[in-house]
Design a protein with these regions (language model features):
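N-terminal targeting leaders of membrane proteins
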Residues: 1-16, 184
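C-terminal beta-signal and adjacent terminal beta-strands/loops
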Residues: 138-148
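Outer-membrane beta-barrel pore domains and translocons
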Residues: 20-22, 46-48, 83-87, 133-139, ...
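Outer-membrane beta-barrel "beta-signal"
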Residues: 1, 71, 162-184
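Transmembrane beta-strand segments that form the barrel wall of outer-membrane beta-barrel proteins
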Residues: 9-24, 40-53
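Extracytoplasmic loops and strand-loop junctions of Gram-negative outer membrane beta-barrel proteins
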Residues: 11-14, 49-50, 95-100, 151-157
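Residues that define the transmembrane beta-barrel architecture of outer-membrane proteins
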Residues: 11-13, 23-27, 58-64, 105-111, ...
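Gram-negative (and chloroplast) outer-membrane scaffold detector with strong preference
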Residues: 33-132
């Protein structure tokens, strides 16, 4: 039995990846599940263990940013979302310092709001989609600062509140209809 469609809508699961993350050498994947016609839940993961060609230039991270989304029409079109985010990081920018998650084990955490637009990538293959999104949030950040040299000693521990853009996406996805199929 095929999935039930109501007014042209059926529940879908999307498998996604963000091109902006890949441009930053961050492996990423996401799953989004339609909960109702207008509400969905997205769960992205980001990971990077990269030194950018040099020991003193790196952006290592592990982050998750689950988000509930409200779609104004169908899951295609305009949406807004509320998200929670947490991440571990270790980065250096060729300067005097290297920054690492506080105490090596306390992630940053916070949340924010996002908006975006999703549309089919191909007219004849609507399961392939592209979405454009931008989000901003507030995060509590505790980090350790080290001298940016081999085995550089710790200089101190800092605390700040980050307020700003916390995600940008050009995301490609493939969607699967959900539903039970019974054998004959």
């Amino acid at each position: 039995m095929p999935p039930v469609e109501v007014d042209g809508w059926s529940r879908r699961i999307r498998v996604k990846t963000n091109a902006v993350g890949w441009a930053m050498s961050m492996v990423n994947a996401s799953v989004e599940v339609d909960m109702t016609r207008h509400l969905s839940f997205s769960f992205p993961l980001y990971y990077s263990a990269v030194n950018y060609f040099r020991r003193d230039l790196k952006f290592r991270t592990f982050a998750v940013q689950p988000e509930f989304r409200w779609h104004f029409t169908r899951p295609e079109g305009l949406f807004v979302g509320a998200h929670f985010g947490t991440a571990y990081f270790n980065f250096a920018t060729e300067g005097a310092w290297r920054y690492q998650t506080g105490y090596g084990n306390r992630p940053l955490f916070g949340g924010g709001l996002a908006a975006g637009y999703r549309k089919p990538l191909f007219r004849h293959h609507p399961a392939w989609e592209v979405e454009f999104s931008l989000g901003a949030g507030v995060y509590d950040v505790r980090y350790d600062r080290f001298y940016n040299e081999k085995n550089g000693p710790k200089e101190g521990t800092c605390h700040t509140t980050f307020i700003g853009i916390d995600n940008a996406g050009v995301t490609f996805s493939y969607s699967f209809r959900t539903g039970r199929r019974r054998g004959r």
